[in-house]
């Protein structure tokens, strides 16, 4: 005879790995063309000047310069890359 009653298996205990989303380069940081500035799901941040947006909404630099964050209309935050000479002013 069994000395313990059969225990059911739990349906919990699984979790997916984090997706490593968020800002990768902060305001004022230097970037070169192709650097990823932000990874996101949907548009938490919007692309401004000097940046491109990938099909997964990743924002990346298309020119060398410094990262800039600006608040825009409807409360949107725009990420831009300013050329190095312009960012120094």
Curated annotation (Swiss-Prot):
Ribonucleoprotein is among the record's keywords: yes
Region (Disordered) residue spans: 1-20
Keyword Thylakoid belongs to the record: no
Keyword terms of this UniProt record: Ribonucleoprotein, Ribosomal protein
Organism: Jannaschia sp. (strain CCS1)
GO cellular component terms attached to this protein's record: cytosolic large ribosomal subunit
SUPFAM superfamilies named among the record's database cross-references: Ribosomal L27 protein-like (SSF110324)
An MF annotation (GO) of this entry: structural constituent of ribosome
Family membership noted in the UniProt record: Belongs to the bacterial ribosomal protein bL27 family.
Name of the molecule in the record: Large ribosomal subunit protein bL27
One GO biological process term: translation
């Amino acid at each position: 005879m069994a000395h313990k009653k059969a225990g059911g298996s739990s349906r919990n205990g699984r979790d997916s790995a984090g997706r490593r989303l968020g800002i990768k380069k902060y305001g004022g940081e230097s970037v070169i063309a192709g650097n990823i500035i932000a990874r996101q799901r949907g548009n938490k941040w919007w692309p401004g000047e000097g940046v491109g947006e990938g099909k997964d909404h990743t924002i990346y630099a298309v020119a060398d310069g410094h990262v800039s964050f600006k608040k825009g209309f409807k409360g949107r935050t725009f990420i831009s890359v300013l050329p190095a000479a312009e960012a120094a002013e």
